[in-house]
Each structure stands twice: as C-alpha cells, then as structure tokens.
Amino acid sequence: MKVRSLLFGMLCMLALGVSLASCSDDDDDSLDDGGSKVTLPQTRVYILNEGSKGANNAGLAFYAPNKDADFISDIYKTQNNAKLGDLGQSMIEYEDEIYIAVYGSNYLTKLNAAGVELKRVSFVGDNDLSAGIRYIDAEDGYIYASFWGGAVAKINATTLEVVDKLTGLGDNLEGVAICEDMLYVSNSCTADYTYHNDVKVIDLRTFTLKETLTVASNPNTQMLEEDDKVFLISDDYSSAEGYVLQMIEPAKGNKVTKIGNATYMAANNDILYLVNSMTDWSTKPVTTVNTFFTYNIKTGQMNNASFLKDAPAELVSSTLHMLTINDNDGDIYISTSDFITNGTIYRFKKDGTFIEKFDAGGVNPNSAVFFN
C-alpha cells in the first residue's frame, strides 16, 4: 500500500510539473503589453501614418484582423498621452518590439507590443545626425539607421544608445537593407535634389564602408532583402517606363541587374510583389494607372498577371503609398493617399482575394508591422 501511495504521489507531482511547465510556455509566447490602457488580442496590426510635413500629426493606428477588438486610430496617443510627432518616416518590428523613426522630430522610439513607449533617443543635438533620421533595419541586437546629411548610426536596440556612426557617406541617405552581414544604403540626392546613382555597402562586422555600387539614378526609399538578395527601386525620373527595379546579388560580387519597373514592392516566400504606378501629369486632374504583378526570385521569371482578385475599381487609379505583406499569413495590405485627408487601407488574402478596406486613421499610411 505504501508503494502504491508513493507511486501515486510521484505521478501527481509529475502531472503538476507538466501543467506548470505548459503554463510557463504559454506565458513565454505572450506579448509584452505592460502599461497598456486597453486590452488587445494576440493577433494585431500596427499602421504608421506619416502625417503631413510640419503638422505634427504622425500617428500609429491599431487594427485587429480577426475582428476581436475595435480599431484605434492613434494607439500611440491612447497609450502615451502624447502625439508621435512630425513625420513618421519608417517602422519595423524587432524582437516583439516596435521601432519608429520620426523624421521631422528627429528621434527614434521603441514601443512594446501594445504601443507603450519604452525608450526614445533624440538626434536633434547631434551635429552628425541632426539632418534627420530616415530608414531603419535591425540585426544582432542593433538598429541601423540612415540619416539625411550622409550618416548611418549603429544603435543598441535595448538601450537606444548610439554606439557608433559613419559619416561622409553621401547626402540624403534613404532605404536600408541587411543581407549577409552587410548593410546596403541608398544615397539618393543632395539637399538641392541633384540625384546620385550609388548604394553604400557597409560591413557590419567592422562597421566600415566596404564598397560603393553604381545603380540607376536616385536610389530611394524602397529597398528590401529576400532570398539572400537585395532589391532596390530607383526613382529615376528620366525613365519613361517608370521607376527602375534592380536586384543586387551578394553571392555574385554585388552584381546589379535591372529586372523591370516598379513604384512599390513587398516580398514573401521568394516572391516579389510589385506595383508600377504611371501618372500622366499633363491631364487635369492628373491620371494614374496602377499595374500589379509579381517576380519569382527563384526562377527569375516576371509574371504580368495581377496578384489581386476582385479588387475595388478605384484601386487601379488611386495614388498608392504602401504595399506590404504579413509574413505570418501572407495577407497583402495596400494603402492609398491624397496627402491631405486620412488614407485608406485595402486588405487582401494571400491568394489575392479582396477582404475589406478601411480608414487608415491618419494621413499618408506608409508602413505596417504584424503580431500573430
């Protein structure tokens, strides 16, 4: 009887241990919502509304794709009792935290998964970085940021301390992407809009400039990494077919190849999703035609068939401001803007089926991050 009792007790303790371990694992999977004033579902989308220059009206909208919470037009203001600032330029998610570069106000902020501000760093008083933060990427515990004025900063992702800077890289630095321990940075133009045609390659292991690549004129904001390659759009105003889409291949000595024309791009599962917006400025009012298509990175084949199904008719002729994809489920998000009133977000399934459209909550929605 004592043996049976002992065995029973051991089994109970084992079961309790498994139960406690399971609960602990669940807790580890949860997001950091510390300090939140609202209850949020685990699946959530944040949309950065850039705002208008000088209007101090940048904002961060919250959207629940599973319809288990109400839309919040500016969750940053809700959570922090403050405005985000002037011109929200770019946003990334890194290690379940949100980083936003606010260009006009010239600072970088770190938020938890509920939009509560954890830290911020201002660059206003730094002579090397005072021209304004632009685009950001992250790797191995650091945020890398481009700045107008020709600088790149290496920032500790935890403390937001600037641990290193590279200056004299060019003029108005824009889009950034990390591939194979290298940071690729677009050198767009001078302050008076004399356009450059180069991309800077920085070795992140030493944080030194490795080389300068020649690309089409005015490499700009659109740059990303997919399948160990870097894709870049140059806003070449001399190109009659539209802005120039290029591929940089690190495995081939950073070979640069033009692969088409596009205005916006996003990537998922080795497919590049593209839109080419052609505007006729001679008409009153101006007219725009948007063409949606894809590029298979593995095969190198362009597919001119639209990746959208039953899209609202107005999307073909609207002014676009964002194309992004939720890596978790493949849903496609496209924004439109008139640069004055609130933008509109169009959401599609991975297969291109239209789901819905909704008010973006602010002016010029330019990026989104996803938590699932």
Show where each model-derived region lies.
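Conserved beta-strand positions in repeat-built beta-propeller and related beta-rich domains
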Residues: 47-55, 100-104, 144-149, 185-194, ...
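Bacterial Sec-dependent N-terminal signal peptides
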Residues: 1-6, 13-45
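Acidic, serine/threonine- and glycine-rich low-complexity intrinsically disordered segments
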Residues: 161-280
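A short beta-strand motif characteristic of beta-propeller blades
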Residues: 69-83, 117-127, 161-167, 208-214, ...
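Structural motif
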Residues: 54-62, 106-110, 151-153, 192-200, ...
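Short coil/turn segments that connect the beta-strands within blades of beta-propeller domains
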Residues: 41-45, 95-96, 140-141, 180-181, ...
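Repeated scaffold domains used in trafficking and secretory/extracellular systems
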Residues: 34-35, 83-92, 128-138, 171-180, ...
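Short loop/turn segments that connect beta-strands within beta-propeller blades
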Residues: 65-67, 112-116, 156-160, 203-207, ...
